[in-house]
Amino acid sequence: MARQSKKKGRPVSGWIILDKPKGMRSTEAVSQIKYLFHAQKVGHAGTLDPLASGLLPIALGEATKTVPYVMQGTKTYRFHIAWGEERSTDDLEGEITHTSSKRPTREEILALLPQYTGVILQTPPQFSAIKIAGNRAYDLAREGEVVEIPPRQVEIETFKLIEMITKDHSIFEITCGKGTYVRSLARDMGRDLGCYAHIADLRRIAVAPFCENDLITWDELKAVELDKSAKNEKDAPFERNFIKLDELLIETISALECLSHYTLSQTQAQQVMKGNTVLLYHHDVPLDEDEVCVLYQDQLLAIGALEKNQFKPKRLFTI
């Protein structure tokens, strides 16, 4: 019988809400967090373009099981639009493809915003991760191929003009649903206003349920990594302070604010951990609910469904 290989790394769980700097790819950020925490498993909840900065939720260990719930959450972006130029990538990185001397007025911009609020059809940028016949659109675009990307529905809850910095630059803030491309918004608004446009700066400031108050920078992480106080002897080979690093993690359950929470007794918890169904007899428990989570001693135990007051576990968590 073949021996199972031991997983490399520590079984550490929780969320790091990284303030991703410009120039770093989301996958690179995940790799660095995995190395820094010497974690067995790490993933992120929503790609952020290399030229964008801001909130990148990174899940470690058991928290990776909650990534889909964060992916479905609303996102808030603050961004600068540069008027007068359209670019191949719809941001500063691309080549200039169209120019205009026209500049929109504040009144023209405000009159346009309602058209970009609510459920709208949006065509993703040529340089995007959308798959076309099995290939990433950005790979085809880099080869000089112009691909036809079908428009898709996205939802924009709020769209605000924050400031007109100059006649060439305006600052906006949006809260939107999954799959919205801010670069496409700039491109389309520029065309509608007859002046062309692209994104000059983009920062994500929230991914529900996480916000700017949860952010931690690379500098802060590195400072904790090098802190020699309260270091565990087992950490010595890594020259990292895992005790202090682990204190920075946000609890796994924090990603599940969108679900109802119910507390189990010890007997119920034991049954759920075996994959068995248990009856929830709390007075406030609904008869049926598609997804809820259950806890034991304030620790996340499982996600599952309620059917006739019975909890059926679908996903278990190690506590």
Curated annotation (Swiss-Prot):
SUPFAM superfamilies: Pseudouridine synthase (SSF55120)
GO BP: any one term: mRNA pseudouridine synthesis
Reactions this protein catalyses: uridine(55) in tRNA = pseudouridine(55) in tRNA
Active site residues of this protein: 49
Record InterPro entries: PsdUridine_synth_cat_dom_sf, PsdUridine_synth_N, tRNA_psdUridine_synth_TruB, TruB_C
Known role: Responsible for synthesis of pseudouridine from uracil-55 in the psi GC loop of transfer RNAs.
Listed name of the protein: tRNA pseudouridine synthase B
Organism: Bartonella henselae (strain ATCC 49882 / DSM 28221 / CCUG 30454 / Houston 1)
Gene symbol of the encoding locus: truB
